[in-house]
Amino acid sequence: MLYLLYEVIQNSEAGRVLNFLRYPTFRIIAAGVFALLLGMLIGPKLIARLRLKQHGQSNVREDTPDSHQKKKGTPTMGGALILLCIAAGTLLFADLKSRAVWVMLLLTLGYGFIGFLDDWLKLSKRNSKGLAGRKKMVLQTFFFLVAVFGLLTTWTLPDGSFGPTLLINTKLTLPFIPTRWFNPDLGWFYVFFAWIVVVGTSNAVNLTDGLDGLAIVPTIVSAITFAVLCYVAGTTLSIADYEVVGGASKLVATPLYQYLGILQVPGGAELAVFCAAIVGAGISFLWFNTYPASVFMGDIGSLALGGALGGLAMLSKNEVVSAIIHGIFFAEILSVMIQVTSFKMTGKRVFKMAPVHHHFELKGMAEPKIIVRFWIVSILCGGVALLSLKLR
């Protein structure tokens, strides 16, 4: 919004004063700081209201370790605070002409709506398991397809007819492998592959949100990682490099994305603004969600954040790399898949309880220790993902 205002008045005296708004780096930092301050400002009032509205509700699932019963009475649906701060920071500082920004907002808020329905059913019908899994999957698929529709445009065939095409690149990039070596094009099959990434990530974050602060810090780390990846893939910055021309070395300016051997992402800098808003909103929520938590994010937060991270993986062309970035989330959902498959096939359980963080709880590990160790692993995963930029 502020960027559009700057474009309108850029040739005036006021426009020269607001010249800093044209720099993505400023708007990235500003979006994060604004989302953080907004969350810290309205967080206490929102939590107090949630506690009042949910008085007498347990908000603790029955299929969790007995130690979780002490968390009864802690309000849920705190993810509404995260979504509000993300939307405000993005709308205020991103370039709203970018279609990618609107697609990410739609995907995030759409998945947040699904989470809201799930939380509301659990609260309104005590001991309810919320929205049925099949209905949840249908709604997740619906909002994903709406996002894909937002990325469609038309092109003209040689015979003059029109056909749809995706605005995003349908080629895949692999970590540690330059695109010039291996860069398969999935064509329209890419839509199905992206669906697995987006819906899978959303559900993985949802499964991870079982301990105080466990899901939000890996989300923050992932958002920071994606901010870097989006910025370098979308920036117009170039790097001095040598090129051999006619047997002689010549100094040339090589675009940063080309130098790093990754795909270009048009509008990547604006996606970085969105990432920064997630970081700011996440830090403000962590202030209230750290052990012992004053509020839980609920499905309204976990499904939305997972959808956002999956969407960023898709739009930044890091679908495969996201398996590294989301290492903790991937491990959590994988543990559930292993547990279910093992029990159905052999009648035996691999873990004491799934997702895997409950396994460590039942082994006697203290909740804060599990949380911090998972945070450390998440940071390492983000570092490895960024390292893959250079090792190509």
UniProtKB/Swiss-Prot annotation:
Question: GO: which molecular function terms?
Answer: metal ion binding; phospho-N-acetylmuramoyl-pentapeptide-transferase activity; UDP-N-acetylmuramoyl-L-alanyl-D-glutamyl-meso-2,6-diaminopimelyl-D-alanyl-D-alanine:undecaprenyl-phosphate transferase activity
Instruction: Give the residue spans that cross the bilayer.
Output: 28-48, 76-96, 101-121, 137-157, 181-201, 213-233, 268-288, 295-315, 320-340, 369-389
The protein's topology relative to the membrane is: Multi-pass membrane protein
Main localization of the protein?
membrane
Q: Where in the cell is it found?
A: Cell inner membrane
What are the names of the required cofactors?
Mg(2+)
Gene name linked to the record: mraY
Entry's EC annotation: 2.7.8.13
Q: Which PROSITE patterns does the annotation name?
A: MRAY_1, MRAY_2
Record key words, sorted: Cell cycle, Cell division, Cell inner membrane, Cell membrane, Cell shape, Cell wall biogenesis/degradation, Magnesium, Membrane, Metal-binding, Peptidoglycan synthesis, Transferase, Transmembrane, Transmembrane helix
Q: Which domain of life is it from?
A: Bacteria
Pathway participation:
Cell wall biogenesis; peptidoglycan biosynthesis
Which GO biological process entries does UniProt record here?
cell division; cell wall organization; peptidoglycan biosynthetic process; regulation of cell shape
Q: Please describe what this protein does.
A: Catalyzes the initial step of the lipid cycle reactions in the biosynthesis of the cell wall peptidoglycan: transfers peptidoglycan precursor phospho-MurNAc-pentapeptide from UDP-MurNAc-pentapeptide onto the lipid carrier undecaprenyl phosphate, yielding undecaprenyl-pyrophosphoryl-MurNAc-pentapeptide, known as lipid I.
What InterPro entries does the entry give?
Glycosyl_transferase_4 (IPR000715), PNAcMuramoyl-5peptid_Trfase (IPR003524), PNAcMuramoyl-5peptid_Trfase_CS (IPR018480)
Q: Which NCBIfam families match?
A: mraY (TIGR00445)
Query: Would the keyword Transport be found if you checked this record's keyword annotation?
Result: no
For this chain, the family text in UniProt reads: Belongs to the glycosyltransferase 4 family. MraY subfamily.
Give the enzyme class: transferase
One Gene Ontology term, aspect cellular component: plasma membrane
Q: Which reaction does it catalyse?
A: UDP-N-acetyl-alpha-D-muramoyl-L-alanyl-gamma-D-glutamyl-meso-2,6-diaminopimeloyl-D-alanyl-D-alanine + di-trans,octa-cis-undecaprenyl phosphate = di-trans,octa-cis-undecaprenyl diphospho-N-acetyl-alpha-D-muramoyl-L-alanyl-D-glutamyl-meso-2,6-diaminopimeloyl-D-alanyl-D-alanine + UMP
Please give the name of this protein.
Phospho-N-acetylmuramoyl-pentapeptide-transferase
